[in-house]
Regions:
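Positively charged, low-complexity/disordered segments
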Residues: 1-8
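Glycine/Thr-rich phosphate-binding loops that ligate phosphate moieties of nucleotide
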Residues: 9-10, 14-212
């Protein structure tokens, strides 16, 4: 499971490709925390079902600043928190908040990149173990208001390295490889007002853990 995530936005300047990179300290590892430390789940696969069972009106936010916060906050002294808990908040709601915080952090990066570059990101192309979680991928699409494009292969880094080696050796043809990957697509379905209200709640939760 991932302990960190990278979000990259590609720009082409003078026939060269540049990648604007953003690093997150805690994404998939928050699920490991739920399993190993809180004992709320026995496997990551349980999280999707629990998230779907959670009360949709619950406003619990989990900020996983266990080792501070990375981009775009860069606050190594920030501390983790769970806020917005009510009497009806239970295991399902906490698990849902843990999944949601992954999507919120990526949304922070996407919005920062769009603001810094003046370029709109139309689509997120994602990989890694959490992409198998349908609830998380739909929420990621909803909260960013972006199409989320997921390859059938979970770990693209290894595949990409093999493809590059094969292309360099003349074994593979780039054009043919480009059409080999099958993908699933999630489209945003959330109302704009609801999206901004949820994201504002996340920003308020983050503000509460920042050291400065």
């Amino acid at each position: 499971e991932m302990s960190a995530s990278l979000v990259g936005s590609e720009m082409c300047i003078r026939d060269r490709d540049y990648v604007l990179e953003g690093n997150l300290n805690y994404t998939g590892a928050v699920i490991t925390w739920l399993k190993d430390d809180l004992k709320l789940i026995s496997s990551a696969k349980e999280t999707e079902g629990l998230a779907r069972e959670a009360n949709p009106a619950d406003r619990t936010y989990l900020v996983p600043a266990f080792t501070g916060l990375g981009a775009p906050y860069w606050d190594e002294k920030a501390t983790a928190s769970i806020s917005g808990i009510t009497r009806t908040t239970g295991k399902a709601e906490v698990v849902k908040a843990a999944l949601d915080c992954i999507a919120y952090q990526i949304t922070d990066l996407v919005r920062a990149m769009e603001q810094d570059t003046g370029m709109r990101i139309e689509e997120l192309r994602v990989d890694g173990g959490p992409t198998r979680n349908g609830y998380l991928m739909q929420f990621q699409s909803d909260i960013t208001n972006k199409r989320v494009n997921i390859p059938d292969a979970e770990e693209l880094s290894g595949i990409g390295a093999a493809y590059m080696a094969g292309i360099s050796a003349g074994v593979y043809d780039l054009e043919k490889l480009a059409g080999n990957m099958k993908r699933s697509v999630y489209e945003p379905k959330m109302d704009d007002e609801i999206r901004e209200k949820k994201y504002a709640g996340w920003k308020k939760a983050v503000d509460g853990v920042l050291s400065k």
